[in-house]
Swiss-Prot record:
The gene is ATT. It is found in: Secreted. One of its GO terms (molecular function) is mating pheromone activity. This is Attractin. GO terms for biological process: sexual reproduction. Produced by the albumen gland of the egg cordons. GO terms for cellular component: extracellular region. Water-borne pheromone that attract the marine mollusk Aplysia into breeding aggregations and coordinate male and female reproductive behavior within the aggregation. Keywords: Disulfide bond, Glycoprotein, Pheromone, Secreted. Transmembrane segments: none annotated.
């Protein structure tokens, strides 16, 4: 059960990329990180809503 709170996701992505030295690209990288994490969260919520008991792709 991941923390799908957007503030949580933002801080996780910023921590992951805190050593990023591409001044122009870091924000883009962080945005992409947030987007993919949000999508993963939504997919997990969808799977649990459909009553699936298996984790991950089969």
């Amino acid at each position: 059960d991941q923390n799908c709170d957007i503030g949580n996701i933002t801080s996780q992505c910023e921590m992951q990329h805190q050593n990023c030295d591409d001044a122009n690209g870091c924000n883009t990288i962080i945005e992409e990180c947030k987007t993919s994490m949000v999508e993963r969260c939504q997919n997990q919520e969808f799977e649990s809503a459909s009553g699936s008991t298996t984790l991950g792709p089969q």
